[in-house]
Amino acid sequence: MQVNDGPSSHPIFVAPVNGNAQRSSGYVPGRIVPVRSPPPAKAPPPPPLKPPVPPPARPSVFNLSEDGNRREQAQNQQRKNTYICVGIFFGIFLLILILVLSLTSKDVLDENCPHQNPALRSWKPGHDLKKVVVIHSGEHYRLDSSATLYSITIQAGGSVVFADDKKGSKNITLRTRHILIEDGGALHIGAPKCRYRSLATITLVGRSDETAVTEVPGMGRKFLGVNSGGTLELHGSERMSWTFLTRTVPASGLATGDHAFQKNFSRGINLRVVDQDTAEVLVNERFDTHESQDDSKRLGELLKALPAGRIVALATGDSAVKNLVFETKQTIHDLLGSNYISDLKYRDAWALVSVIGGGNGSCTEDVREHENHDTGGKALARQDFFTVDGVGFTVTAYSEWSNGYPTTGFQVDAVDKVVLNLQDDVSSWNPGDRIVVASTDYSMYQAEEFTLLPCPNCNRKQVQIQGKPQFSHVGEILDGVDMRAEVALLSRNILIHGEMENSCYGGNWCQYFSYDTFGGHIKILGNFTSVHLSHIELKHMGQQREKGRYPLNFHRCGDVDQSGGYSNPAYVDSLSIHHSFSRCVTVHATNGLLVKDTVGYDTLGHCFFLKDGIEQRNIFFHNLGLLTRPGTILPTDRNDSMCTEITDRVYKGYIPIPANECKAVSSFWIAHPNNHLISNSAAGSQDAGIWYVFHNSSTGDSHGMISETKAELTPLGTFFNNRVHSNFKAGLFIDRKVKSTNATAADPREYLCLDNSARFRPHESSDPSRPRVAAIIDTLISFKNNDLGAWIRGGDIIIRNSGDGSYPKDEGSSQEVSQSLFIGESRNRGTNGGQNKYWGIGGVDGKMRTLPRNKTFPIRGFQINDGPVRIFDSTFRAFSPTADRFTMAVGFSLKNIWQLTPRNNLSALAFHPSVTLRAFFGRPGDWFEQNDLDGDKNSIFHDLDGSISGYADTYVARADNFLIRHPQCVDMPQWNGVVCSGKYSQVYIQTQAASNLSLSISRDEYPDKPMVLRGIRTKTSPSQQYQPVLMMGKSYTMHWNGPAPRETVLSLINFDQDDWALLGLCYPNETVFQITSDIYNKQNNGFEGIEDYGPVTSIADLEKRQQERKYFFDKSAGLLWLYARARHRRDGNSYCSSAGCERVKIIATIRANQKTETCNCTANAYPKYSKPASNIVPMPKPNTEPCGACGASQFAFSSDPWNSYLQTQIKSLSVKEEQDNDTQAYITVNAQRFDLSQSGFLLVTVDACSGKVTKNSMFSSLDTKMEQFFKTGIMKRSIVLLATRGQPASFAGVAQYLESLGSAKTPDLQNKVAIAFFGFLGQGGPSPQPWSTLLTCQGAKILGLQERFIPLSLEEYSCPPKKDSPTRMDLELLKKIS
């Protein structure tokens, strides 16, 4: 059916009809043609005059009276014309007045508002799911009411606009199977300068098994589609998209945990005593006052002993009055204000919540009489309180008889009381909105959704949530790393969603998903006229069974920025995409798209997804991806079961290997390095947070467009201030490619599965012959990733300002880490549950915490692999092993077969006292297995300055590696390591057709300590390679566990000019050799400088002529001796010389009768060639002075690096701690320490604007001086830090002064043994801050060291304006690359 209300000649709110080709340079999407007043109505002509009667003929004589008559007639006509003009004027005025009055003040015409275009006609199509609507050219409709239609097609010159008004009172829902915007058509909901205020919903309907529903070519079903030349402008109300917590929210909402109790037949009076400052249940007891007068008296005595202010909850169970003595009743009446206790009868249900000393005004109680084993409901008492930190909580007591069963219960909880403190102004978030709080633990499944409640007492940076959190969510910088949870708004006032079935059906992968995954989708095709989307919500979008059906898909759009001729480039801004069934935002063969402030939550498959490996210049700015689950579409989306069970695209019979080919689902899947990531957060994925993967050529629908992408050679785009956490495999992953060929018998793996053969090696202009370009990873925050914080492999890569082949692929490249902070076990201990499988003891503090794998999994701060890698100017904290687990600051890849270069170097490192294991080389056992693979044995690094080992310019290697030792080496038993001086390089020993052999290498100085290597390749490979690290200037023998290989190549790796090693290779004694040297040029894959080796007659002769190309074959020992000597210089990090890779090639001709001999010549070689052990480079003296310049220069690594944070620490001491010989009580401010050496109080104040310490004062007691200090001695806008030592006089008296410094109420400090207080005095007096907190302990408990990172110069502090505001580097970078 076609709807046509007739043509219109009014101005049209659409772009030029022919798409990109006809856009003017000044076209601004969302702007309508200026409103013009309608042309004035033509005035009706005056009534025709009667034809004049000719006067009678008379003489032409001048006559005065006749002339006067003519004047009078003329005046009459003029007056008549004047009346007519006045009438016309008032008519026009009346028309305008009617028009204006017909528009309320809220609808004053605004040229930026599409719904106010006078060309629009009201449209109310009604509800008919069979009605097919086509909007033709010249038809411009304003949808004024909800509608249900089969489909809408907006053709060239047609437009649809959703109605709106200033109050946002519209609530329009459009249900349809699809909306198709064709060339020249337009759909508008709001505009960038006229935000949509009402509620607009587009519901896309349909099932995947509706075969009668025809698919639209290129679009499919259940979609909103934009064809070439179409316009889509959707702009909801501006709202904060996502922000961070600024105060930790504990599980249950209460730091001490909630309390719930319910029991039948708990006879007597049940009691709970609750700390009014913390909500902790202090006493949990039952008193059988029915049976025992002693219990009754004990209850009375306990109540009398409680301090004033303590919360008490009482509830009867079964019967409570038979032996409830009068004195106890009187105590309950006097202390708790009960009015019912004296009149309780047998089996009455009674409940009370009150405050000691609060009298009747603080008492809430209820009683219900017992009759026929029933009380007709609960006796319920409930009161609300708040902690000293301002957290609301409820104490409930209840008692009931029902169906002959008595029930007693208590609850202490924060249900509907939890307030979230947030970093940004969220006054645009409203009650009823849905939000999600990200996990800050290992499991991404600890992300939690909440509904917002009204909160009249909240400030603009606070919201109150319904219910309570199940898990802890960190809201602060811990141990120097920003671990604040992301908090995202899911609700928007423009919603596009798929209408879903209640469960999975048909062929929608129901074996993997129990729910319907056939959602709606939005597809944008190339050469559109205008597409801008902002502040909209996409829910239940994407189709898991169908490729190319994503929540938002820019499909082969080409350049969508100014390079593509768009004066206003396309963008996606502040979208909420959640509960999606296939990705979040797909950028497919599209360049220059800006995606900012967008949330992708709970999706199947890669979330922010670059598809074909040719997408470039796209900008991802301040986006959030969390809870990214596996999907089925691509091998890289799949988990184990999907990988092995979906085999329709592998070669017949092949079963994929999940770890190698699948299991890569990521929140950000970046298929080409020339894209920009700034201030994004990947807060939970089944595999990786951000994965840079490489394509050899364009893939997918773009297959064949670009035969060679050179992605591995392309410089990295901007990477700044991104964060990755709660990901199972890795936070950041830069490695591997996807397979770009179909499955064959030769390679049965599926097209686009993972492939391990890529190495990122960026060069200028993607040309390997031009200089390398370092990839800069600037400001990476990584924490709580199960396996790896970051896995980065390839060319020159530099990581800075961050918190957590047979040859290397790119000659001369290296990876570098600087100005970074590594934390082993942070104070973020996590919450047991939420699919966290492991819960165990921490090594630093001995407290229970979540663990990444199990309790034995080794935790490594900086993991050395391959190389060369360099780390310097970095700090390590909290690496301490347990009895079950090794936790080390510096470690190595587990079960490593690969090479480790001695050029890996470390320097200027700082280790916090909480680091008790600086380095570890593994031991046989869990996770390390036998610890005997080639890479395990050759683990080594260069300690440049001794900051890790204490010996400058030394090498640290595994303790049992005697290829690198000398007698002066220093053993490090705890590390399973040894520290040695010397020069070290590698020889790669490559053999042909002998890959099943093991190689035994002995140094002549330690012949009884050989190293046995298996080789890095499989036993069925055509060649094998062994990669030992050798001390230069020493001699070695090499032996085989089988027949010697016919062809062996020795490659000199990391040799400096004139470095040498004397090598003796074992062969049968009748072997004939052809030995040559050459230089391998990797650039042209050729060999140069080929020279033959000649024989000499003795080892002594060989030693004299080591500069020459000579060899000696000792037939008696079976050893072929020759020098591996570098003749050319090596530059920088190059592993080969400047001339190329120097090699020695040995072709052995072995007699037929000796071809099966096992060539192990050890027995003949020694003691003949044994030598005394010695060092070439003397061991340095140990460092004696601490390195003051070592470590990272920053104290805090935050996700808002333009803001400054103050590191503050408070260590208070109780009397018991002093008795236990702890003598340290102090306050530190950015490492400036103020000691408290005697019993008393220490107060330090800091200017909250500059971070400068303004005062530090010690008081032995709360005397008049200290009181005066509290009253007048603290400057406005001051951070106030308070520590205590011992038990000074008037300890509890300090409480009265803390409320004015940020405490939510006057705390109870009676019986407390230590205090640590972080407070703030605002410009106008008390100004509680999210970081303000009071910590106390009593009895045998201790506070320990308390640390807070406090933000400086917040807007709330009312600091004076600065001359130079901090530079927002993220915005500067965005401006630069946009």
Swiss-Prot record:
One GO term describing the cellular component? plasma membrane
Please indicate if the UniProt record lists Isomerase as a keyword: no
Question: Where are the bilayer-spanning segments?
Answer: 83-103
Q: Ranges for the GG-type lectin domain?
A: 257-414, 1203-1363
One GO MF annotation is: carbohydrate binding
- Database matches in PROSITE patterns: G8, GG_LECTIN
What GO terms describe the biological role, i.e. biological process, of this protein?
Answer: angiogenesis; atrioventricular valve formation; cardiac muscle tissue morphogenesis; cell migration involved in heart formation; cell migration to the midline involved in heart development; embryonic heart tube morphogenesis; endocardial cushion development; heart looping
Q: Which CDD domains match?
A: PANDER_like_TMEM2 (cd13938)
**Does this entry carry the keyword NAD?**
no
Q: Which SMART domains match?
A: G8
The source's superkingdom equals: Eukaryota
Could you list this entry's UniProt keywords, alphabetically sorted. Angiogenesis, Cell membrane, Developmental protein, Glycoprotein, Glycosidase, Hydrolase, Lectin, Membrane, Repeat, Signal-anchor, Transmembrane, Transmembrane helix
| Residue span, G8 domain | 121-247
Cofactor field: Ca(2+)
Q: What happens when the gene is disrupted?
A: Embryos show defects in heart morphogenesis: while heart development is normal at the linear heart tube stage, cardiac looping is lost at later developmental stages. Defects during the endocardial morphogenesis, characterized by the formation of ectopic atrioventricular canal in the ventricular myocardium and endocardium. Maternal-zygotic mutants also display muscle fiber detachment, associated with impaired laminin organization and ineffective fibronectin degradation at the myotendinous junction. Defects in angiogenesis, characterized by embryos with no venous sprouting.
User: What does the UniProt function comment say about this protein?
Assistant: Cell surface hyaluronidase that mediates the initial cleavage of extracellular high-molecular-weight hyaluronan into intermediate-size hyaluronan. Acts as a regulator of angiogenesis in embryos by mediating degradation of extracellular hyaluronan, thereby promoting VEGF signaling. Acts as a regulator of heart development during myocardial and endocardial morphogenesis: involved in the looping stage of heart morphogenesis. Stimulates migration of endocardial cells and increases both myocardial and endocardial fusion.
Q: What is this protein called?
A: Cell surface hyaluronidase
The UniProt gene name for this protein comes to: cemip2
